[in-house]
């Protein structure tokens, strides 16, 4: 499966796509290059997120559903939450994390895992917490 380069806050990361989330990966790859803003989470602990509102990640004409989903990502795991209980989002864990929103615990599709640059994730998280929103770019490596 292809690798994704993630650039944010002056840091570069290399992520591998997850074979257990093929629908999410297939649909997300069609968006690349994908540029957005990343902010610090409010409810989930040590993570940053890309709020996507009502956006739906589509595979063909159908929204991507849950696959390989978890509420407890490890450092370097990237989750795509397809909704519908909270807004659609991308979550990037840099430390201890229990994925949640104001309505309670959520589970997102573990679709990417950072394999290079992981040592800079905490620095990105702290920068995002104290300096605010950062540009983030997802592109094919």
Model-based region annotation:
Residues 16-141:
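Glycine-rich active-site loops that engage anionic ligands at enzyme catalytic sites
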């Amino acid at each position: 499966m292809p690798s994704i380069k993630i650039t944010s806050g002056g840091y570069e990361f290399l992520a591998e796509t997850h074979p257990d989330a093929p629908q999410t990966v297939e649909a997300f790859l069609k968006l690349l290059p994908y540029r957005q803003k990343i902010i610090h989470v409010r409810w989930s602990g040590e993570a940053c997120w890309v709020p996507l509102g009502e956006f739906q990640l589509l595979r063909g004409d159908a929204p991507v559903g849950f696959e390989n989903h978890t509420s407890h990502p490890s450092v370097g795991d990237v989750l795509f939450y397809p909704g519908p209980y909270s807004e659609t989002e991308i979550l990037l864990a840099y430390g201890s994390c229990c994925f949640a929103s104001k309505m309670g615990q959520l589970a997102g599709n573990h679709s990417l895992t950072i394999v290079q640059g992981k040592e800079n994730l905490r620095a990105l998280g702290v920068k995002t917490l104290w300096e605010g929103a950062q540009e983030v770019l997802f592109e094919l490596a």
